[in-house]
């Protein structure tokens, strides 16, 4: 099987590398070490800026771990966010399905809240066990556990905890944005977030809406586009899109969005629509003026 090598201090999957171990001979064969070294030198890094030598140097400095890469049918990568109080109580804050990309699908691009109900309760139960053990060790504050889930031969979901992040992660700020916008709260027993009205809320969020085309926009432009297309967050309905991380738009053409809906389908539709609309507006903005007038 393939193996995953992870740096201890890597973030967003950029400290990960995949090693192809398929077809290697028995460890007792004379050329095993040579063949293994060849596989290691050809490992696939998640970041294009990383080389074998630089990865090896980082591994020596900060340490890391090698583990089996879980593969299977209907592969998904959810996560559970938790908190340990000063009294040692473990609280489930949220569950998410992670949106991953990059060369080997290890880079964190965004998230969908909550995690799929088919396996959300499963990973929450397993995460609580981990949280209670961490509390016994004296952990305090926020942390998250990343999982992979796959279907077994019987069609049932199996979960594998693959990483503990003892820090605030990429799913923290979109969840807090939802709390701020709606004044609602997460109901652990249901695995849902409910507004004061009792209505469940869902979102898709990303920090990686990025294109050189978007450098043409100011933060005000983005707000105007959302309002002009009726995509902005509507406080009355408590649905819509909020943009953030706007300081990087002019320089890098990058910003973030949180698309809030009353169902998973609505939040996904809003997320896709805002991408389509902003791309179209960006293409229109850079077209020569006389070309626009002829249309």
Q: Predicted segment positions?
A:
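Low-complexity, highly charged intrinsically disordered N-terminal segments
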Residues: 24-25, 271
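Short conserved micro-motifs at the rims of enzyme active sites and ligand-binding pockets
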Residues: 78, 93, 172-176, 268-271
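Phosphate-binding site of ATP-dependent enzymes
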Residues: 2-14, 19-21, 31, 35-100, ...
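Generic, well-ordered alpha-helical scaffold segments in large soluble proteins
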Residues: 98, 126-133, 180, 273, ...
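Active-site loop ensemble at the mouth of alpha/beta enzyme cores that anchors a bound cofactor
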Residues: 156-185
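Active-site lining segments that contact anionic ligands and/or coordinate catalytic metals
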Residues: 77, 90, 140-144, 156-161, ...
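A long amphipathic alpha-helix within ATP-dependent nucleotide-binding catalytic cores
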Residues: 48-73, 104-156, 195-232
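Peripheral (often C-terminal) accessory segments that flank ATP-dependent C-N-forming ligase machineries
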Residues: 183-295
């Amino acid at each position: 099987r393939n193996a995953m090598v992870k740096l201890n201090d890597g973030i967003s999957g950029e400290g990960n590398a995949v090693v192809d171990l398929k077809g290697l001979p028995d460890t007792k064969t004379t050329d095993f070490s040579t063949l293994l070294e060849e596989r290691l030198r050809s490992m696939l890094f998640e970041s294009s800026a990383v080389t074998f030598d630089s990865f090896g140097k980082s591994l020596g400095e900060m340490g890391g771990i090698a583990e089996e890469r879980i593969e299977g049918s209907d592969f998904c990568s959810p996560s559970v966010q938790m908190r340990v109080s000063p009294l040692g109580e473990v609280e489930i804050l949220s569950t998410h399905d992670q949106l991953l990309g990059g060369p080997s699908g290890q880079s964190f691009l965004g998230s969908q809240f909550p995690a799929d109900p088919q396996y959300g309760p499963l990973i929450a139960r397993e995460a609580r066990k981990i949280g209670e053990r961490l509390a016994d060790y004296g952990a305090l504050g926020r942390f998250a556990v990343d999982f992979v889930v796959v279907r077994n031969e019987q069609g049932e979901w199996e979960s594998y905890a693959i990483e503990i992040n003892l820090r605030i992660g990429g799913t923290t700020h979109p969840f807090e944005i939802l709390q701020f916008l709606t004044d609602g709260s997460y109901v652990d027993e249901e695995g849902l977030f409910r507004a004061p009205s009792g209505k469940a809320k869902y979102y898709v969020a990303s920090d990686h809406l990025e294109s050189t085309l978007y450098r043409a926009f100011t933060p005000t432009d983005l707000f105007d586009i959302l309002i002009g297309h009726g995509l902005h967050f509507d406080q009355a309905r408590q649905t819509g899109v909020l943009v953030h991380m706007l300081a990087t738009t002019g320089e890098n053409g990058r910003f973030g969005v949180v698309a809030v809906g009353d169902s998973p389908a609505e939040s996904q539709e809003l997320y896709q629509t805002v991408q389509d609309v902003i791309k179209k507006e960006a293409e229109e903005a850079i077209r020569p003026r006389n070309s626009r007038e002829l249309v």
